[in-house]
A protein has these predicted regions:
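A conserved structural motif in NAD(P)-dependent oxidoreductases
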Residues: 92, 105-116
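Short, flexible catalytic-loop segment of classical short-chain dehydrogenase/reductase
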Residues: 64-75, 84
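Alpha-helical segment proximal to the catalytic Tyr-Lys
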Residues: 7, 51-52, 129
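Short C-terminal tail/terminal secondary-structure segment
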Residues: 27, 120-121, 132-146
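Active-site helix of classical SDR
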Residues: 2, 38, 46
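Active-site loop-to-helix junction immediately N-terminal to the catalytic Tyr of the SDR YXXXK motif
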Residues: 28-36, 48
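Residue(s) in the substrate-gating loop at a strand-loop-helix junction
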Residues: 22
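Short, small/polar-rich loop/turn modules that mediate ligand/substrate recognition or access, typified
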Residues: 54, 59, 131-133
Length: 146
């Protein structure tokens, strides 16, 4: 996607690339190695693009969501139902357990898609004109990294 966008941005005088990663790139889980590796590589790609193209007025940043309440959790047979079945509890209790015990979030609640969308809206706006080569973590405090 970036490969296609950069020439158009160069022709129009600049722009903002926003990549959507995952905290799985920094906090890999069992059985998720390919996904984690791809998301970590996306961080390096975005920073490389920022290094090359920021002098040409193209910024590049990554939004790094944590657990987010999407249809992957809510659809029949989704993550919520799978966890509920595994633990023998209802779906909402299973999701609460996920974010308080299994993969603790400081907020004790999953993010919503709008939480990520608001950060992306900022990063593509003129308000972020000096923001490039950055990671914006939106994970309810899951990573707690310094």
């Amino acid at each position: 996607m970036s490969r296609a966008a950069v020439p158009a941005m160069l022709d129009s005088g600049g722009g903002s690339l926003v990549h959507v990663g995952s905290d799985s790139g920094r906090l890999p889980e069992v059985g998720n190695q390919d996904y984690a590796a791809a998301k970590l590589a996306l961080l390096a790609l975005s920073k490389s693009l920022a290094t090359e193209f920021s002098p040409l007025a193209i910024r590049s940043n990554v939004v790094v969501p944590g657990p987010t309440r999407t249809p992957l959790y809510d659809r029949p047979g989704g993550f919520g139902d799978q966890a509920a079945e595994l633990w023998g509890i209802d779906k909402e209790s299973a999701i609460t357990r996920m974010v308080t015990q299994i993969r603790p979030l400081l907020t004790h609640k999953m993010g919503q898609p709008d939480d990520i969308a608001q950060v992306i809206a900022y990063l593509v706006s003129p308000l972020s004109r000096q923001v490039t080569a950055a990671e914006w973590t939106v994970d309810g405090g899951a990573l707690r990294q310094v």
